[in-house]
Amino acid sequence: MRKSKVETAKTRERIVKAAGAEFAANGISEAALARVMASAGLTHGGFYRHFVSKDQLVLEACSKTLLSLVASLELLVNRKPREQALPLLVDHYVSRAHRDQPRTGCPLAALGSELARRDKRTRHVAMQGFLQLSRLIASHLETVPFRKRAERSMAIVSAMVGAVTLARIAPDSPISDSVLVATRDYIIRSVRRHR
């Protein structure tokens, strides 16, 4: 019996979600398609009914994960007082929880160096996600002069991604926690200086 278009779309969505988690946890090159499909509750043989290649799956998983991340961060600060929004965003992203759970975190922090070596379309999707995160941060930089918000927000997102990436190198080390704390403090102090 053939699946309906709705069922096929739901299955594809499950594969993309499983792939995003698998890539973030194990790296793109280490994530076998058989493991991705098993994580989605499917057999390896069904992969090519949904995707032309692993590259196509990487592109879609990166896009979907970044869109979900930005949406969840927007929801996190929705209806919060302006002065609490930026610290809340920074604390949430640059955290032990994010460091310790790469499967559910930002693909830029989990896969940055691998994404840099992917095809042009995938790099474009990754940069669009970076820019969306930057725009979200910029929207909460009311103490920074308007003309400097874009560049400041890009620097902040770069620091956030870098901190989580570095903290994951030695997650059981006191240095790991220090990197997270120092980066959070530095970002918030640097923004407050521009009042």
Features from the language model and the residues they span:
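Hydrophobic alpha-helical connector segments
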Residues: 60, 74-105, 153-156
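Short, basic, alpha-helical segments at the C-terminal edge of helix-turn-helix-like DNA-binding modules
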Residues: 63-68
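Hydrophobic/aromatic-rich alpha-helical bundle segments in the mid-to-C-terminal region
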Residues: 119-128, 141-195
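Helix-turn-helix
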Residues: 14, 22-56, 60
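Amphipathic alpha-helical segments used for helix-helix packing
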Residues: 84-88, 100-127
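N-terminal intrinsically disordered/low-complexity leader segments
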Residues: 1-10, 193-195
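Active-site oxyanion/phosphate-handling segment shared across diverse enzymes
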Residues: 130-140
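Solvent-exposed, amphipathic alpha-helical segments
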Residues: 14, 18-25, 72-75, 159-166
